[in-house]
Amino acid sequence: MDHVKLVNDPIDIAHIHQLLADEGCGASSVFVGTTRDNFQGKKVLSLAYEAYDSMALKEMNKICSDLRSKWLDLKHIVIYHRLGTVPVCQASVVIAASSPHRSEALESVSFAIDQLKTRVPIWKKEIYEGDNDSEWKENKESIRPKKSKSGFNYAACPCKVEESHDVPRTLVQIRVNDAELAKRLECFVNRKRDEINSQNVIDFKSSFVSSDKDLSDSCARTQSTIIKQEQSNCHLKVRRVNNRCGPQQMEMRPNYELELNKLMGSRDGQTDPTKEMRKSLPNSRLQAIESYMGLTTDNEENIFSRIKRVENRLLQLESISPEYRHFTKREPSSMEAAPPKKIRKKSYSAQELSAFIQKVKDGSEFS
């Protein structure tokens, strides 16, 4: 069993031994980290520990899982860390493990100590005696990235400015004194703050409030009404729309086009655009196209403008749905000439060619 805890009181070592006790275990290894009274010649009075509790517990549980994956015979694992002020000689951390054999217990505890120092977000502050200031200690074993040593050191390269040098007025964008500049900055910050507050009211505050209440001092923090949506990390409500018809069904319904063809097949013979075209005036062909496209017909309008509107309508229909094809079926025109038929040339044998040549020589072919 895993026992992971962050405590603010002194750690009871006897209680740790009770957690490790098991009839099937022949070895228990316990590490106790305590506060020492000196550091580099300075007298240490105590240590102060702070932690990111939720993340620290999560990492400590991960360490327990890693231990069990490496040493399968481990029975009980204990990781206790104390927070707050820890005086000299008192325990700040206890790591213990029990197993049937001593090798697994010793190796697992040693591994857990190194992982705790490397991965768990716990910070230590040393409090010294006398005039020495307290100091937060850097964890040199941490795997978190540190500042790059190759970064540019601006302090080592000070910029010298000659006060006597006059800057051209063309290079100065703002020509006001410090008071006016501070006033402008304050106005800008206040305006951005008002914009954020108004947006928070729109996103978070309830619109169903009584008009008799004074809401001049209200804000989203005190009167927030939005409830977090289930299975979502967003506070705004999200809806999923499933279109039962249209081009989006092409992927979800493989037979959509076939079903559409069957459904619209009965309507194909209801109207015959060619009959109307033959009966109407010379521009009747364009009028028929406009009627099928759902466009209003104006005979006084320029014909090129009407054709342009028809083209735009076709592009729109092509972009939104394939159904338009059933309303604009192209029929072959009776005025179009039929394509020429292919004529297969006759093949002659050698005897037929010889007879034909002989007839030409005799002149009987032309007589």
From Swiss-Prot:
GO (cellular component) term, any one: molybdopterin synthase complex
Function of the molecule: Catalytic subunit of the molybdopterin synthase complex, a complex that catalyzes the conversion of precursor Z into molybdopterin. Acts by mediating the incorporation of 2 sulfur atoms from thiocarboxylated Mocs2A into precursor Z to generate a dithiolene group.
Stretches the record annotates as Disordered: 326-345
Broad EC category: transferase
Subunit note: Heterotetramer; composed of 2 small (Mocs2A) and 2 large (Mocs2B) subunits.
Protein location: Cytoplasm
CDD domains: MoaE
A matching Pfam family: MoaE
Cytoplasm in keyword set: yes
Remarks, miscellaneous: This protein is produced by a bicistronic gene which also produces the small subunit (Mocs2A).
InterPro entries for this protein: MoaE_sf, MOCS2B_euk, Mopterin_biosynth_MoaE
Keywords, comma-separated and alphabetical: Cytoplasm, Molybdenum cofactor biosynthesis, Transferase
Catalytic activity: 2 [molybdopterin-synthase sulfur-carrier protein]-C-terminal-Gly-aminoethanethioate + cyclic pyranopterin phosphate + H2O = molybdopterin + 2 [molybdopterin-synthase sulfur-carrier protein]-C-terminal Gly-Gly + 2 H(+)
E.C. no: 2.8.1.12
Binding site for substrate: 101-102, 117, 124-126
Predominant cellular place of this UniProt entry's protein: cytoplasm
Name of the protein in question: Molybdopterin synthase catalytic subunit
Pathway in which the depicted protein is active: Cofactor biosynthesis; molybdopterin biosynthesis
GO biological process: chromatin remodeling; Mo-molybdopterin cofactor biosynthetic process
Family: Belongs to the MoaE family. MOCS2B subfamily.
Gene from which this protein is expressed: Mocs2B
Any one Gene Ontology molecular-function term assigned to this protein's record: molybdopterin synthase activity
Organism of derivation: Drosophila sechellia
